[in-house]
Amino acid sequence: MSNHLRYRYSRDKADRLGQVFTPESIASLLVESLPIPSQGVKQIIDLGAGQGALTKAALKRYPKSSAVLVEIDPLHVDALFATMPKNINIIKGDALDLGWENGLNADIVISNPPYGMLQLSDSINTFLSKTNLPVPTNGSWIRGDAAFVARAWMCSSRGTGLGLIVASPLVRDPSFRQLRETLINQLKGLCVTQLDTHVFDGAEVQAFLITGMRSTSRKRNVLLRKASIDGTIIDELEIGWGAAVNRLDFDYYNAMKRIGVSSSLSPDTLASVGTSIVRGSRSHNDFQRLGLDAFHTTDFKEFSEELLLKGCNHKYNVARPGDILIPRVGSRCLLNQARVVSGEGLFTESVFRLSVKERAREKVWRTLSSSFGSEWRLANASGNCAKHLTVQTLLGMPLIS
């Protein structure tokens, strides 16, 4: 099966395959986090082995074990043959294909999967069906790391240790809630470690280590950790099952702890009070070319509280008195908010309009303009370079009483 990026052209072969290579310090951290003692580990499987960093770290901790490395890139395969011990089995092929694992009995499965989108294939559909993992798909596409999680699951059984590196959607997006619940229930000693966004050379990604041992299904607490760029653990906390199925990122719960909000608190949300959230109809540049004024993220500094709008054009989305505007995108401006007190006007696609029933407006405004509202938006923003908020995420925002 060939891998494909979605929506853009790749810069090089590693980019086309969605590869980011694991630094030695992070490989060691992942292996050291596995709740599997060194005695009795006979076989390790490395899915999409790349340059072999994970296997090298695993062989240091489990020196009496053998390893099977599966890698699709012929250049990396040649390098692996040149650097790995002779008793290591290196398979040139796609880890997502079926058949190569026949006869293997893995004690540990490790992987740093590709982060791009992959087209669904017969083999992917087969192991998604066999594992019965609730992995979301988007039409004929699936996240690469999600596909590799399912593949690792198929290669494992009760007692097998799993060590995976995944991107942030699997850890915190609502669409992956059911998958998180399955992992939490069936991985004993589950630990999720948030990595520094600059840990991978030449890429800025928010990635996480997921480590645990497959076990009988039960509700469990989860250990969350934060690692520095060199793989040193700098902080940790434990959360309960109910919070964990919602999300598993350390920064979020640390922010909630810092501002004194319980992770298990379930107050009203923007959704429960009937909030409507829409983005602007055009970009800032588009409106400028049309000769139309539109409220943009750069305007929040000047109008931090109350807005008097003008320049209404009903061909596009319009903000009216009572509406609240917040930035949709922009790492530096996500803390801002403004409410319309007079007039009507346009707003750009970088801005969300929140329309709230009158009885709940003050509650929503009080929440958004509080320190909790700022911390919550920062903790829930997605993306790496340009942080952004989604409608689905915002609708789940809890409200201060």
Specify the residue positions occupied by each region the protein language model found:
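Generic structural signal for buried aliphatic residues
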Residues: 162, 324-325
